[in-house]
Design a protein with these regions (language model features):
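Bacterial N-terminal signal peptides
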Residues: 8-23
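Histidine-rich, glycine-flanked metal-binding segment
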Residues: 30-35, 42-88
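Divalent metal-coordination and catalytic microenvironments
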Residues: 40, 55, 60, 82, ...
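Metal-associated gating/positioning segment near the N- to mid-region
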Residues: 75, 80-152
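Divalent metal-dependent hydrolysis catalytic cores, especially in the metallo-beta-lactamase
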Residues: 119-147, 155-172, 192-209, 231-235, ...
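Active-site core of metal-dependent hydrolases
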Residues: 205-327
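His/Asp/Glu-enriched, well-ordered alpha-helical/loop segment
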Residues: 303-384
Length: 449
């Protein structure tokens, strides 16, 4: 066959194959997406997306965000019409329950001690959270144990602020300055750069008289030194006293990018006697100081939050400070709902629960629905009615709006779906669903198997 004949033969073969392929039934072609969320209102502040659109997920990654993706292109389709589809929420103030040291506040064996205790990492999934940041539960001497016992096994992504105290959040040792070794702290952070995103200091010498072993700024200064050595931000849980003032902390001690958590706690003078917002907050923000909610069981007062929000001061990030002392009444969506009831728009709250905290911990790959990024997704619903919200002073605020999580997707897998959005109605379930297993045999397949 001549060269021209070979070319003609190849072209005819290609045309025949293309024509044949175009006539193959759709089911013979492999679906482009493993999962398709269809008809939801997508809010992705990182990409300035705020519209009704479909989200396609493939191989655990965001594969498409478009106004209309055919259902035939997906192996599984979930109708999320009337719901919000957002990046997975990020809770940057969380406390993990793990073995820890014998005196660790958050250790299971320490339940007899006064004080809060850590909670399971995956509890966060029920609030649309796909990333939690442990806020100093572990220090340099206990982080490896936390990693092996919790981080390595959690479905939710777990990152951490390393406590400047080597033993971690441990009541007595938190008051021991010799436990605060900036070099050891920085060395540990460098050893786990993919997991440890910053430093945490908390609870140091809040009441007792100062002495040579307990200088006022010891914990703050040593945490800052570790932050400088490791080039990471510091999160501050702080109690002001005459010798270490709030103004000095946020206007002099804290660096740009450092995080002041518990901003609406009772001890901070964020309001002047006349009720106006303390101008040092705006000054600190201009310096680059970050303000975080860190709600917790003792760090959120409506008497501070409501007037501040009305005057335009909204924390940069939402967070829970979740532990056994508050988990029965608190979650990430509950924190968001309180601010929603104060008049903060949902779109703004999603920004402060996704892209903002991602920037604070220097993880721009998180808190986004960008194509190619890991498919961490929250499906939320805004409810309207009569709701009561409580603060840590046992006071109530009434509201008429609330946000709840309806589905959580972590790395492309549905890990929370309490209403069965992704499930078949039981009457339409396949045959194996109705099969009773024989004694001693394997369990029957589920409706989606």
């Amino acid at each position: 066959m001549s060269s021209w004949g070979k070319v003609r033969f190849f072209m005819l073969s290609l045309a025949f194959t293309t024509a044949l392929g175009s006539k193959l039934p759709a089911q013979a072609q492999a679906p482009r997406y493993d999962l398709l969320l269809k008809g939801g209102h997508v809010i992705d502040p990182a990409n300035d997306v705020d519209k009704v659109a479909d989200v396609g997920i493939s191989a655990g990654k965001i594969a498409a965000v478009a106004e209309s993706i055919p259902a035939s292109a997906a192996e599984k389709v979930v109708d999320v019409s009337g719901l919000y589809v957002t990046p997975g929420l990020i809770d940057i103030h969380y406390h993990l329950g793990h073995g820890g040291s014998p005196l660790n506040w958050f250790a299971p064996e320490a339940r007899s001690q006064a004080g809060p205790l850590g909670v399971p990492a995956d509890l966060a999934l029920a609030a649309g959270v796909t990333t939690v940041v442990d806020a100093g539960t572990a220090g340099a001497d206990t982080f490896l144990q936390e990693k092996e016992e919790v981080i390595d096994h959690a479905r939710v992504r777990v990152l951490a602020f390393l406590n400047i105290v080597a033993d971690g959040m441990n009541g007595g040792l938190e008051q021991t300055v010799d436990q605060m070794d900036p070099q050891l702290c920085a060395q540990t952070i460098r050893k786990f750069p993919d997991l440890i995103v910053g430093v945490k200091t908390a609870h140091f010498w809040t009441e007792k008289p100062w002495d040579a072993l307990h200088p006022p700024w010891a914990a703050v200064d040593r945490a800052e030194e570790c932050g400088r050595l490791a080039n990471v931000p510091v999160m501050f849980d702080f109690w002001p006293r005459p010798e270490r003032t709030y103004a000095e902390l946020i206007l002099k001690k804290m660096r740009p990018g450092d995080i002041h958590t518990h901003v609406f706690a009772q001890q901070f003078p964020i309001l002047l006697p006349d009720g106006k917002l303390n101008p040092i907050l705006a000054e600190a923000r201009r310096r680059g100081v970050v303000f975080d909610v860190g709600h917790g069981a003792g760090s959120f007062w409506f008497r501070n939050a409501v007037p501040a929000v009305k005057q335009g001061f909204i924390p940069d990030s939402m967070s829970t400070d979740l532990h056994l002392g508050d988990f029965t009444v608190l979650s990430m969506t509950e924190v968001m709902s309180k601010f929603l009831a104060m008049g903060v728009p949902l779109e703004d709250l999603i920004r402060r629960s996704t892209v903002n905290p991602a920037k604070e911990i220097r993880r721009p790959d998180l808190g986004t629905l960008s194509i190619g990024q890991e498919a961490d997704v929250a499906v939320l619903e805004e409810l309207h009615g009569h709701f009561g919200y409580i603060d840590d002073g046992n006071a109530r605020m009434n509201g008429n709006v609330k946000v709840v999580a309806r589905m959580t997707i972590r790395g492309g897998r549905i890990v929370y779906d309490p209403s069965g959005l992704s499930m078949v109605e039981w009457e339409k379930a396949p045959k194996q669903y109705f099969t009773t297993p024989q004694l001693g045999s394997s369990p029957p397949a589920k409706a989606d198997k």
